[in-house]
Amino acid sequence: MAEDNTITAQDALAKLESGELILVDVRRPDEWLSTGVAKGAWLLDMTDENFGAYLNAVLQRNPDHQIAIICRTGNRTGYLQSVLDENGMTGVLDVTEGMAGGPNGTGWIPRGLPIQDAREAYDAMPKDLIAK
């Protein structure tokens, strides 16, 4: 049986706040600006041509942290997680309920979990992970 690499929004928040987890929001920039992002999330647009290299850099430089990915409803991250697994990037957790919620759960924002302006999150990221 396959390993369950999913995590709830509440558990992701707890691990993020304790410093055990890096949360990567893989939505598009217009989505980040529209809704805000999970407080403390790193922003890596999965449609960026360099997304794979950026995500690999996150994994390589943070071997002692769990990495979780989040999108709007969990559909993109579910697909992305399977692609990552097929390419040897295993162990990435999927926040299946996403930011807005959907069939997999209530969602980060509807749960009232902390969010921040996307520009603040972007400014706090390591500069070499920011798309040019």
Each PLM stretch: what is its role?
Residues 25, 74:
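Conserved G/P- and acidic residue-centered "switch" motifs that form tight phosphate/ATP-binding loops
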Residues 70:
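Short, surface-exposed ligand- or partner-binding patches at beta-edge/loop junctions that are enriched
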Residues 1-21, 29-66, 77-132:
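Rhodanese-like catalytic fold shared by cysteine-dependent sulfurtransferases
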